[in-house]
Amino acid sequence: FHQFWICKFAPFKEYKNFYKWANDYVDITQKYLGYAQVKDYSNARKKDFWHHIRYHIITFTQAEAGFSTDVKEIILEVDMKPITNKIIDKLHRDLVVKSSDGKLILADTGVKLQAKHLQLASGTVKFEDGSSRIIDDSKAVFVKEKFKRKKLGIFYKFKEELEMLKQTFGNELTTDLQEFDNSDKNIALQFISGREGLSLRNADFLVAINIDFSAVTYFQFRDRMTTMDRKENTLYWIFSKSGIEHKVYKAVQSKKSYTNDLFQKDFRIKATSKDNSQTYSRRLALR
């Protein structure tokens, strides 16, 4: 909206700000962030405004630019340690887990439960006091053993996953693109920071040890190895067996972000709103 709003010749100039525009073109809903209730403006009705702006937008696809890369995606499953699944089950059941040293994993809202579940499924956890811990390095060990003597671009989602990769790969890992291009080291990049503007053309494969809820991130991740002279790219997704990652992947591959509504449906969680907080009645659908 802002890019059009700053131009006096563009449509929508009669709206004083985004919020006035959103009242006419967005299905505004409520969502919970921690204990706060905020308005969600993400569901814009494209069918109502696209005819106003399509004449002002120029599209140029990779195919039109001469790119003809075939992207092959392979899912590999990893058996996580029993403790990992036990913590996930208990968190769904009780919404809180206490470690042996008194640290709390708290999932008192649907958004937090969704995020904690995904993080735990890849072997790390962030406690309520802000500290993090590696509880299961199965995915990192699997990647190191599976892809020996290969040059990898490894993507992770949560910060503690980088520490897990560093502990597993040691000196075989870098986070610097220049060092990656000029050595035999693998590179580790976070989805959000590594999804845009970086070319990993020197990687043999891209490997993701987790997955982001965003469909935009999914498609930008797929393009990190694309060049005009590279005809085939192979991407590996490392998922826990029967884990939440499979459900997220199904959504983002269909160009849909994995929302909390989808999470609640997949895991049979019924959320109710009362006094700006959420309580949950649960029946697990963990396979």
Over which residues does each language-model region extend?
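Signature of the SF2 helicase/ATPase Hel1-core->accessory helical subdomain module
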Residues: 1-30, 211-214, 225-228
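Catalytic donor nucleotide-activated moiety binding site of glycosyltransferases and closely related
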Residues: 159-166
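Non-catalytic, charged low-complexity extensions flanking SF2 helicase motor domains
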Residues: 234-287
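Conserved RecA-like ASCE P-loop NTPase motor core of nucleic-acid helicases/translocases
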Residues: 151-158
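Short beta-strand/turn micro-motifs composed of small residues
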Residues: 118-121, 156, 189, 239
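Inter-lobe coupling linker of SF2 helicases/translocases
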Residues: 12-150, 252
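Conserved RecA-like P-loop NTPase helicase motor core
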Residues: 162, 173-255
